[in-house]
Structures are given as C-alpha cells and as structure tokens.
Amino acid sequence: MTMLLPLFILVGFIADYFVNAIAYHLSPLEDKTALTFRQVLVHFRQKKYAWHDTVPLILCVAAAIACALAPFTPIVTGALFLYFCFVLTLSVIDFRTQLLPDKLTLPLLWLGLVFNAQYGLIDLHDAVYGAVAGYGVLWCVYWGVWLVCHKEGLGYGDFKLLAAAGAWCGWQTLPMILLIASLGGIGYAIVSQLLQRRTITTIAFGPWLALGSMINLGYLAWISY
C-alpha cells in the first residue's frame, strides 16, 4: 500500500477533522443543543487552533501512514484505523471533560464483537469474555475504592471503554492493557504535577486505556498476519 501513501495521509487529515468535530459535538459539558452536526463542522473550519490542538492531527496522520505501511488485509487495516479513531475521539473528550459518552463506548463494544464474529483476530468467545471481564474488573475496583476511601476512583465510562477493549482484544490482554494504562496515568500525573507545581487530584484514565488497548490490538493484528 506504499503507493497509496499520499491518499492515506489525506485520510489522516480528514479523520482528524471529524475526530475533533465529533468530540466537540458529543462533549457532555458543552452547551450545543441548538447546533446541528453540520454547524459543528463549520465551527471547526473557522476555528483558530492552539498548538495542543495539533496532537490529534499528528496522531491521525501517523496512524494513517502506519496503516498504509502495514502488511495486513484491507479489512483488518480498516478495522484498526476505525478503532483508533474511536478511541482518539474518546480520549479527546475525556481529557477535556473527564467523561466518556455512551454514544461512542457502546457502539465500539458492539463493533468489536461483530468484527471478531466475522473476521476476528480472536475467537468470539474470548471477545465476549473480554467484554464482560473488562467491565467487571473496573466495576470491582470502583466499589473497592468506594468502600475503603468513600470516593469514586473511576468513572462508569472507564468500565465501558475497557469492556469495548476486551471485545476487540480478548480477555487475555486485559492485564497488559491495565498495566500500560496505569503506568501511563501515573507517569502523566507525575509530569503534570512537576510542571504545574500543584497537586493533581484527578486525571483522565480513558486515554491511557485507549493507549493500552491500541498497542495490544496492533500486536494481535501483527501476530495474526
């Protein structure tokens, strides 16, 4: 697919545009009830961007280039890029609002089950067990923290995102996903605290779950090739 590299780069730019527009449209803390999705797209064409707004663009273009160079079948390549766009959109929303909307997490979960049922990188049984275990593990952590500390350590959106990751990657990958997510979250908290010189009380965990799941999904695709 290297001959199609310019086309894939263009796809990366287009994907970034829609990732940001959908993230804005679905962001729960924004009052956009009077805006249609088309008006949101117009808003993003006219918006002036800060330097940090280029991060999703860089990631989208990098992911598109990786897909162009990957030796996978078109179905697997398309599925990987679709998963990436979903979790990137969720990460943008979570960083901004610390919320993960059901309108993205639940379709992502069902898409994972359907993909593995038809073209799967893993057995459908492993995908179903992964979805159940992904939700259940963080549900237990949530209530464990609540009983001990009397406060919420996680959000319900994190449960659903890990369930979706389990549906795509299987239950066997959940420990590694959680390890990567935990290390990423801890590292981010430490760096943020050093740079801002104040105590960080909460962080968005969704982006780190997204990172861990994307790494594991890419690895599964590679060993299945």
Swiss-Prot record:
The keyword S-adenosyl-L-methionine applies. Its main location: membrane. The chain crosses the membrane at residues 3-23, 68-88, 104-124, 128-148, 175-195, 203-223. One of its GO terms (cellular component) is plasma membrane. It is found in: Cell inner membrane. It catalyses: Typically cleaves a -Gly-|-Phe- bond to release an N-terminal, basic peptide of 5-8 residues from type IV prepilin, and then N-methylates the new N-terminal amino group, the methyl donor being S-adenosyl-L-methionine. Residues 24-67, 125-127, 196-202 are cytoplasmic. Keywords: Cell inner membrane, Cell membrane, Hydrolase, Membrane, Protease, S-adenosyl-L-methionine, Transferase, Transmembrane, Transmembrane helix, Transport. It is a multi-pass membrane protein. Belongs to the peptidase A24 family. Part of a cryptic operon that encodes proteins involved in type II secretion machinery in other organisms, but is probably not expressed under laboratory conditions. However, GspO is functional when expressed from a stronger promoter. PANTHER family: PREPILIN LEADER PEPTIDASE_N-METHYLTRANSFERASE-RELATED, TYPE 4 PREPILIN-LIKE PROTEINS LEADER PEPTIDE-PROCESSING ENZYME. This is Prepilin leader peptidase/N-methyltransferase. The gene is gspO.
